[in-house]
């Protein structure tokens, strides 16, 4: 068994135009990530919907840092309810590959700058706490302060809320993670109604989280920039009395 199947990652993301890391993930350039921080959820959704990516958004989160915008490259991991024989095979793979610590550490240990941990935990909160303060601190250090999205819970909320990371989770519980097995790192995961692939650009806002395929990331930021420029021009012309709000809101004439 191979928890992190590099070849499979490359096959699943073969339409990405970008370089890849050692795990096969597409690496959307830092410049695009920086520009993505100014994109609204609605702007990103509009581009994705136009390309028939209709199930890339998930809402209804407990957002520990609503004043922060989360942007980064997805590192995915998937848990399943614990079954003894599967659990034993996974831990044998971990020993064979020198993985240190508990299974909740393994995906965190792969994180690099500007990565976002995306955890499929089938909505489990009690005993589904993907991180606490120690792992949250490790995420902050390894990523430079991005964060995580977990379809499950976290613990140590009072301490985690003080870390310089964004956290989107389903809830908080004092228990430790238990009764689950990590079966895959950097494979497809289901987060609510969305399918996420490793290397997707994660955009988390007060609205929710949207997952942008790498091949569409540049189009998303360019469309957003055009929208902001149009909005700025329209507001300026309205304030100057040149155009009315009705003229600005409709399709623009050649003169405009």
Predicted features along the sequence, with ranges:
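Feature captures the catalytic cores and cofactor-binding loops of soluble hydro-lyases/lyases
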Residues: 30, 34-198, 212-256
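A structural signal for short secondary-structure junctions
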Residues: 196, 203-204
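A short, compositionally biased micro-patch
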Residues: 153, 204-205
């Amino acid at each position: 068994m191979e928890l992190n199947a590099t070849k499979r990652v490359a096959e699943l993301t073969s339409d990405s135009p970008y370089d890849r890391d050692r795990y096969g993930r597409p690496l959307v350039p830092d410049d695009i990530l920086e520009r993505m921080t100014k994109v609204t959820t609605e702007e990103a959704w509009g581009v994705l919907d136009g390309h028939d990516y209709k199930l890339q958004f998930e809402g209804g989160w407990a957002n520990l840092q609503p004043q922060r915008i989360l942007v980064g490259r997805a590192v995915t991991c998937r848990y399943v309810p614990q079954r003894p024989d599967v659990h034993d095979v996974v831990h044998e793979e971990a020993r064979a590959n020198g993985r240190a610590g508990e299974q909740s550490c393994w995906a965190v240990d792969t994180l690099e700058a500007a990565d976002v941990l995306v955890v499929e935990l089938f909505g489990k909160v009690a005993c589904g706490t993907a991180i606490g303060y120690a792992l949250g601190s490790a995420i902050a250090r390894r990523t430079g302060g991005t964060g995580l999205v977990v379809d499950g819970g976290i613990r140590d909320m009072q301490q985690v809320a003080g870390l310089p990371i964004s956290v989107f989770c389903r809830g908080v519980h004092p228990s430790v993670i238990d009764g689950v097995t990590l079966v895959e790192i950097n494979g497809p995961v289901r987060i609510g109604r969305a399918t996420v692939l490793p290397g997707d650009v994660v955009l988390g806002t007060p609205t929710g989280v949207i997952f942008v395929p790498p091949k569409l990331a540049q189009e998303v930021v360019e469309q957003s920039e055009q929208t902001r420029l149009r909005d700025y021009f329209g507001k300026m012309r309205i304030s100057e009395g040149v155009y009315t709000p009705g003229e600005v809101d409709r399709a623009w004439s050649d003169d405009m």
